Amino acid sequence: MRNVLKAETLERRFPLLSVENGCIVSKDADLTVAFEVELPELYTVTADEYEAMHSSWIKAVKVLPEHSVVCKQDWFVKETYRPKTDDGEQSFLTRSYELHFNERPYLNHKCYLFLTKTTRERSRRKSDFNTLCRGFLLPKEITDKDAAARFLEAVEQFERIMNDSGHIRLRRLETDEITGTKERPGLVEKYFSLSLEDETAVLQDICLKPGRMRIGDKRLCLHTLSDTEDLPGRLSTDMRYERMSTDRSDCRLSFAAPVGLLLSCNHIYSQYVFIDDAQEILQMMEKNSRNMLSLSKYSRSNAINQEWTEMYLDEAHTKGVLPVRCHCNVIAWAEDAEEFRRIRNDTGSQLAMMECTPRYNTIDTPVIYWAGIPGNAGDFPSEESFYTFLEQAVCLFAGETNYRNSPSPFGIRLADRQNGIPVHVDISDLPMKRGIITNRNKFILGPSGSGKSFFTNHLVRQYYEQGAHILLVDTGNSYQGLCRMIHDRTNGKDGIYITYEEDNPISFNPFYTESGKFDVEKRDSINTLILTLWKREDESPKRSEEVALSGAVNAYIRKISENRNIRPDFNGFYEFVTEDYRRMIEEKKVREKDFDIDGFLNVLEPFYRGGDYDFLLNSDKELDLTGKRFIVFELDNISSNKVLLPVVTLIIMETFIAKMRRLKGIRKMILIEECWKALMSANMSEYIKYLFKTVRKYFGEAVVVTQEVDDIISSPIVKEAIINNSDCKILLDQRKYINKFEHIQRLLGLTEKEKGQILSINQANHPGRFYREVWIGLGGTCSAVYATEVSEEEYFTFTTEESEKLEVQRIAGGPEGSLEGAIRRLAEKKREEQKQVSNPK
């Protein structure tokens, strides 16, 4: 059936002529250069930084010639998260993590900037001369070629000023990004479909009716700020966000944030600044002032307006500020009537939050939408703008965006604080490359119950799956589930869990190496180990004793290297010293006061066959930990044992130092949990100090986790080694320490900005999701708060609740059962319970 209603084609009314060399040329001979704008991330900007951004915008706009238009468009489009499950090599937990966020809605944000050079005549036109209202468009020719060249030079200056600001980056759009290609839609196409999809943009009919505008099924509502009476009495660059502020800290957002990311519906927030002839504006104002003065006796409002106009003129002349015209609008859309009513009310409420008067505009929606076409800002109706100064106009610019994915191939997945979707964060390599940090070491501080274990499990799992060697030192069995999961997945090749139990005591063989070779580091570690067994912590060996011990170790190594039939272990070493080495020192006539061999053997006897600790150094398992990628030393049962703990400590350090030196080009991490307190002997302190200062040279990182910062500073060596050599600081919920946070701030050298971010942790968590927030600071210059949200599968793997761990083991059928199968069942059960709670019948 033929359409009998009068319809107009988009082609006939289309205001753009072409895109040449990245410049949009309109049929009215306007030139427009388009940029994509990279704004700072939400909740990471301070009041001073907002001021600096504001100042940069002002400097940049001032370089543009007269009759230029600055149009900044912030697009906020609802989308759903698409999990990255294409990689066939994904582990069970990685896949579970991605699927946990499947189809989670979020508000995607893109910011574009259009700099347009128009003419004096065009800038004065009203809505009745808009290209929508004219019968036909005849392309005009650019008559002043020099003006076009000057404008393009000014645009380059504008771009350079903004990029040099350090807060905002502009990227000039290429021709294909504006016009699109056969495979991908361009920006203009996206505007006509109100979509940010890169794959397809479905063009739909545009319906213009009195009081209503539709694009396909999307119904548009428009709120405008087009009069000074709509604005609050005072504009500022930023505002305090109460939900994440405390009486001791501030969380700042840009003044226009309520109509930005805080407005959770599909919308475009457009900000226009029109640069006219400043002298002409002031002359017009002078004339208006005189007219109102002459008419003031007839109306009080004329007198008031004359007074305001005089104040405007005084401000312009005394401070030399630039008079401009300004307009802002929010175009929101929805597909059904109920949602349309909701977004209309929400938009009005958010404008009211800015202390602006919400003006719901129905008549001018098509005209203002049409002027928002990229490159068509010169078509904006002049009666919809108001006079102000550049400083005030720029206050209405939205100043933040969503969290961004790091471009680095390495990193961890954490959740966006605003939308709750995964973001890729690199806290090691890229910051190092950019000079933000000088080492990869990390200091993690969080009280009990703040989510430390979940965060560290989440961290080390992702490091391991990206090829890193992980060595964990723990008390409390926090990593038991993850270690067993890795052990099962690798069929025992990885996931080595070393702990002390009565029926399965901890045991090593310091004389075993997979290659049968003993380098200098291995010999030194054996010497240090035996010296620790022989001498008390406060007892220093004589030089002659050190020489004798080194000689014994070297002689025994020579013997076992020459005769491979000898099984090397501590028992063999003890017997070698008892017989062979005794003979050797007698031949050398070593005096007893220089080396008391009988006293030496007497002290070491408990570790020899039949002694109380004969299990410790005589393991029959041929296990070289250097090649194992995930090792957990669980020290809970020996943390107070003065004999076992020093020995195990040395084994740990020897293992990691061997990894450091031998594994070239492979990432290494040692993570020391709360047990570091028990390891703070004089020897261990020196090890920690050495480790934190040198691990960066071997592509490694040392991580210390603690509940109390005071525990760290009680040891001057540790304070100097750990805090001063950890450029990455990670803090969890500090609300229970809020009254003494100044102490923590001083010890860790935190800035006021970082303090505000840390104290905002968990202040405004989403009620429908279970997660804990974590603050990550890099080098004192780059910091943000993220959410540690894990899947149900990860939850049951990482949990430290004893009842939940026992339930997992029960369903798995004991240590030999299928842990993955048990976790799948429990996770599914938990999801079903959550569905029943959220959807009760």
Regions found by a protein language model. Name each.
Residues 31, 109-111, 469, 629, ...:
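The start of beta-strands in P-loop NTPase/AAA+ ATPase cores
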Residues 23-29, 102-107, 318-323, 415-417, ...:
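Short glycine/proline-enriched loop/turn "hinge" motifs that connect secondary-structure elements
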Residues 35, 113, 442, 631-633, ...:
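Hydrophobic positions in the central parallel beta-sheet of the AAA+
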Residues 40, 47, 51-63, 263, ...:
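P-loop NTPase motor domains
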Residues 428-461, 470-479, 496-504, 636-756, ...:
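Conserved P-loop NTPase motor cores
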